[in-house]
Amino acid sequence: MLKRPAYYNIFLLPTGRRLAKTYNILENLITLPKTDWKLYETIEQKLKWMIQEYRSDWRDRLSHHERYGMKVRLTYRSESERTKLEEKITDLVISHGKKASTVHFCTRESYKGRVRANQILILLEPEGLGEVEGLTVRAEGNWMSLVTHCLFILGSTLTCFGFVDPARGCRFNLLPYIKTLHPNDKWLLDLQASWRLEYGVSRSIEEGALYDFFAESHTLYAVRTWPGCEKYLGALEAFVGRLAVLPAQVLTSKEHDFQSKLMSKAKKTGFHYLYYLVSFTMKTSLTDRIVKEALATVKVFSFVVGRDHLPAVGVYSGEDFSKQFLSMAVGTMDTPSRYAITIVSGMQVDVDVKSVTGIASFKDGTQHTIVDEILLQPARLVLLGRKGGGKSRLSKIFSELGYNVLDSDTYGKVLTLVADRGEDGLDDALKKFVRLTPDERKAVPSIFETEMDRLCEVFGSRGLRPYAQRCQQQAGRLHWELYAAFQEFYDRTIRVITPDKFRFAYFAELERGGFDDNGLTFSPELKTVVFVHSMPELFEAMGGCVAEIVPTHSTRLAILLRGQGLSVNAELHLHDFYVALNQNGARKVSLGWLVHALNELLKMR
């Protein structure tokens, strides 16, 4: 029997393979062995029946029926029928070479949760008791074929549920054939509607032909659950197949050790790297002294990117390289590389890609458990991030996911509008702010930015040099006095209108009307994501899912290059104040990894 494909698709099913041959969609379609053909034939029968029987919620019902073991409800008209049904089902099970204990008859109360491996849970009920989750079949209906199907695929890694898992499916564009498509075959459109990838767009037909519909030698294994891979549960000595090599970043120490052993067991041709290290040089002479000193001893820089966004070796313009590859970077290896990718993106510096190599050892401090939590889309998210750390980019992705977004700078901007009116002025200030245009909002300075700018002038008159002149190399008494003065102002200000009180009032006003910082109205999904600058603001919201965003680039250099705010000097000092204030606290997640994971999630919608 052939192995599990990298992605499920309609060409594994009899109807899909018939269409492929009829319309010459695919060449050299591998003929399935009889055992596979029989399995996919029975899977197709149930999928087609489900789609036709439960038009609106067939996926949910199928999930209940199959995801945690087999569960089926059979309804009967009289109690005498019940006894006969039990006997017929038991006889059917035994006739298929299974033990009678394979089937367990249960009550409605126990018709929930997980089922033991290699067991079928059957709920026998009289008709008219109302709906339950999952599948319901009448006794006079075709229940025997359904139970037979359950017995046939019991214990198999290929189930009907696998065909509707969004992360495991790959669509094929059937629209060019829709006019001539037989009505009885249009259920395939419903089947692949939620799949996140598409042949010819995000996955090539060549890869599909090789791995999906499908090659005998191919099973792509990984040491943990991962899209497009099958988790390897066997012994080290028994490993045969291709290994998806994941970076240490996303693995526990135990998983990483097991992967290393599998890599030594597998042949090099069996490696399937999912992430790569791209090394490049910059084709420019650096004149800025701070940047020049930081990069003086480093000539080659690097970043990590997924296999779907790999550059070829060669020269690229800074603009093209930034858009196509740096925007997809999931991490960097060192501080000089953070500087380099910030320079390339901000100054459009041309680059020369020297090498692209698969990577397994990359780790930047991200705790991947927090990524998994965020991907579950909790109702309340609070993310701590530096100034210039890429929060705006994240906020747009969360908006696409249906979140109501509160930007980190909004708190300070609204406090500027509140002025000296305190809590009494908050409602009026919020009503005004959520109805401002994006340009009008940009023109409103943050109260914290205004105060830092004022203090920079005060301490500048005492001899404090501008930030860009040696501040990163040395800090003296005036720097500490500057931050101490700002700390006093900051502590006093956040106690007048606390961050948590502000957040509650902001979302309440947004629900009444107006727009958030991404120009969107209030989302009815009632999910919120709040970006903050500091730990004190974060502690005001301990109750949601909390994380700190670690930037992939140099935030100081990004602020210097973009030149936003009242002054670059004040922005840079604010940046350092927040960094010093935060230190260690929340679980950390790399900006690149989180953006990468959320974009993968968006593909599934």
UniProtKB/Swiss-Prot annotation:
Location in the cell reads: Virion; Host cytoplasm, Host cytoskeleton
Protein origin, superkingdom: Viruses
Task: Name the chain's protein.
Answer: Microtubule-associated protein VP10
- Keyword tags: Host cytoplasm, Host cytoskeleton, Virion
Q: What does this protein do?
A: Minor inner capsid component. Displays NTPase and RNA 5'-triphosphatase (RTPase) activities. May function as a cofactor of polymerase VP1. Associates with microtubules and plays a role in the formation, structural organization and morphology of viral inclusions, where the assembly of cores and the replication of viral RNA occur.
Q: Name one GO cellular component term.
A: virion component
How does this polypeptide assemble, per the annotation? Interacts with VP1.
